[in-house]
Amino acid sequence: MTSTQSSQEVLADHDTVGGDNTSNKAKSTNIFLRLIQYHYRVTKYEKSEEQVLRESKLLPCIPFNRWFLIPAAVIIQFCCGSLYAWSVFNQPIDVLIYGEVVNMAPITFYIAVGSFGLSRNGPMVSCLLGTTLFVVGNYITALALYLRLIWLVFVGYGITSGVGLGICYISPVSALQKWFPDKRGMASGLAVCGFGAGSIIFAKVQLPLYNNVGLPLTFVVLGSVYLVLMVLSGLVLRTPPPNFSVGSDQTENGKVVEAHANGDPPDKISLIDALTSNNYRFMYAMLLANSIFGLVVISRLANMTKEIFGKTPDEGATVVSINGLFNLGGRLCFSILSDYIGRKNCFIIMLTSQLIILGSFSTITTTQTYWAFLMTMFIISSCYGAGFGVIPAFLSDTFGATNIGSAHGLILTAWSLAGVCGGLTFTAVFNAYRDGAHPSDPHPYNINVWWIFGVVFLGWIALLFVTPTAKDRAFTRRPRSFFRSIINRITNRERSFEMN
């Protein structure tokens, strides 16, 4: 390829990647599987020398460095993190449109989450497309609030912005997994911790902004801020050049070649084999279970602090901000921790913690123990955020970094399912038990907890069947080796004593 040729996107050859068995499976007559295979097909980019040279510079006078991607990814995720602060708008939107609180606004949050997991066409172009949709969705929401049309709010924020959020969420994560094959856990954690940071800041900014300019103009101002920040950050995103390497980890044409230094590399399998494997199914159930309670809590946390515990709206917004800090901390700390103790072990900690909290939730709310409520909610938020920090590295370790973009995008539909089905179910049950009840009565929340407990328990069972990664196996061997060494020392001393 000469330097004058343009960059071409070429469909990866599944036959050569997966072997004869993969080829036969890829050519399945199952129409649904073939549609998935086409929609989430593996692609590679063959870059011209001209493009490689151009992308080697961030600016004409500044050479590009892979670490520039970290702040760009954090800023993009930071803007997307405003989704987590949506609960601040629940009551103002209901009052503006209906004149009273009718619990319709939270549904927009669930629809927005349900739009995640869509396909992309490369980090920079995808991010700019997602930004356009996200910003336009905010402007449509402003128009909907001006006209007082709740269905247009659903279309604007729930669908249009939701699709844009989904595209912008995955683009930097996929790029960082390719640029940082030596630090997958850290890279995925840094990429998504901006989401938590966004919820902290926007939860505090949105309420004063609404009080000063009104609800419709709030979305106009926010949309304009998103436009500037996300476009500038999106222009930084790119894929690695051909044969990019870091230590013993190498990429070819932007595709990562696994290194034995990071553990046993996964077999070279096609994307369709990865998506239809038992491991992927169990991981899907695992992520859904880890997401469902966190989604419900985040969208109603401000309401619970005000209704059950009688706190002020300002304190409710503060709690949402602090909750976002724990969300951020969970994403970053667990993802880094997973580089040492393993991805599966981290998910075992997350789901077990949630089961314990769900079992004690009714007691905490009934007795109105505020400090215990805050502690459990912050732990739930940490575990919820941690799932999104660990899952990209978990997928890379299990199925290979070549498949990470599409595998990550599709598995986020588990989050969508938890948001839509779980959120709407929660709302239906909540409204049914809320009729005639006092606003401070926690029973509508408590009754919902038990079906969520069942979902999380099933996800915990599914997690047990997920194949552990090399890091998981190495970590579980350490305690055995430690105790074995102690036993050997004691045995050797006894033998030495007997000989003497």
What are these regions (language model features)?
Residues 93, 165-180, 187-188, 301, ...:
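Intracellular juxtamembrane helix-capping segments at the cytosolic ends
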Residues 2-80, 263-281:
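Cytosolic juxtamembrane N-terminal segment immediately preceding the first transmembrane helix
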Residues 195-244:
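Helix-loop-helix hairpin linking two adjacent transmembrane segments in secondary transporters
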Residues 86-93, 272-334, 388, 419-426:
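Extracytoplasmic gate region of multi-pass secondary transporters
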Residues 113-123, 331-343, 430:
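Helix-to-loop junctions at the C-terminal end of transmembrane segments
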Residues 283, 293, 308-394:
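C-terminal transmembrane helical hairpin of 12-TM major facilitator-type secondary transporters
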Residues 137, 150-167, 288, 371-386:
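Hydrophobic core of transmembrane alpha-helices in multi-pass small-molecule transporters
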Residues 132-146, 353-366:
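C-terminal ends and interior cores of transmembrane alpha-helices
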